[in-house]
Structures are given as structure tokens and as C-alpha cells.
Design a protein with these regions (language model features):
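Signature of N-terminal electron-transfer/Fe-S-associated modules in redox systems
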Residues: 1-138
Length: 138
């Protein structure tokens, strides 16, 4: 629980108040996806979500995916398939993929592309698809 201006973007509460820096700042207008978190099961861009919109909701960040020192299946697939290059956008992509797979454990390529719309300057989109499909087939 934090006391601040209700219009403060959730991203800044996560990074500055909670000290969780896995959620990245990219564009600040909700387009790039580096700031993606999961709110009540939905992938959401935290830079354009006011903190007032998440009252009494479950907010998950990349840090919450690891359980008891073990990475989630999608995080492990990202490593196994050597997805990241610079890595800046990857936490947001993992969060978008996690939200998708929770709702749709066997998504089509079209559903995957519609759900993971994050921008990657390094162009790792094919590796992202391979990692997600590896989790789907496991």
C-alpha cells in the first residue's frame, strides 16, 4: 500500500516505491511493451496505467514468476532458446507470453502474435515464438 497521486503511472510505483526494476521504462506511452505486467490475469502496459486503476487488483511483475528459486517454464524456455540479445524488452515479452499461456495454453501463431505485441529493437521475434511454442509442446 502506497500513498501518492492517483494518476502516477503504475510503472513508477513498481520501480521506485516497490524497488522492482525488472519492469522497464521504454516509450512511456504504452506502445513498446517493455513495462508489461499482469493485472488480474491480463497483460497491461504499466507506463500508461494510473496506480488508481489497480486498487484491490493483483499486480504481477517479472520478479513474481520465479518460485522458490526456480524460474517459470516460460522464463526457462527464454534461456534454453537463447531469446535475449540486449534483453531490455524481454521481461515485458515474458509477461505478455505468461498472460497468454495462462488463458490459452495452446495458442495458434495468430493468437501468439496478437498477444505478444512488444517491440524488440534486436529482432528476436522468431526466437520468442520458438520459446513459447516449446512451452506449449512440453
Amino acid at each position: 500500500s502506497v500513498e501518492l497521486d492517483p494518476t502516477t503511472p503504475l510503472l513508477w510505483v513498481i520501480r521506485e516505491q516497490a524497488g522492482l526494476t525488472g519492469t522497464k521504462y521504454g516509450c512511456g506511452v504504452g506502445q513498446c511493451g517493455a513495462c508489461t505486467v499482469i493485472i488480474d490475469g491480463e497483460a497491461v502496459r504499466s507506463c500508461s496505467t494510473p496506480v488508481s486503476a489497480v486498487a484491490n487488483k493483483k499486480v504481477e511483475t517479472i520478479e513474481s514468476l520465479e518460485k522458490n528459486g526456480k524460474l517459470s517454464k516460460i522464463q526457462q524456455a527464454w534461456i534454453d532458446h537463447e531469446v535475449p540479445q540486449c534483453g531490455y524488452c524481454q521481461c515485458g515479452m515474458i509477461m505478455a507470453a505468461t498472460a497468454l499461456l495462462r488463458k490459452k495454453p495452446k495458442p495458434t501463431d495468430a493468437e501468439l502474435e496478437a498477444a505478444v505485441t512488444n517491440i524488440c529493437r534486436c529482432g528476436t521475434f522468431q526466437e520468442v515464438r520458438k520459446a513459447i511454442n516449446a512451452v506449449v509442446k512440453a
